[in-house]
Amino acid sequence: MKVNDRVTVKTDGGPRRPGVVLAVEQFSEGVMYLVSLEDYPLGIWFFNEMGHSDGIFVELAE
């Protein structure tokens, strides 16, 4: 995923929420995405762990 991609994010117990990627940071354990959400227009960070499906919080929107 890259900046300006439309995504959905997994949050605690609720439905996936739509957003837009504002920034991407690569790490050895995975990738951090700064995602603008309706409640957080300036963005909130989400981490996608590599190799662990439970650790995937950001996905491309369909």
UniProtKB/Swiss-Prot annotation:
It comes from the Bacteria. Coiled coil: none annotated. Transmembrane segments: none annotated. Belongs to the DsrB family. This is Protein DsrB. It comes from Enterobacter sp. (strain 638).
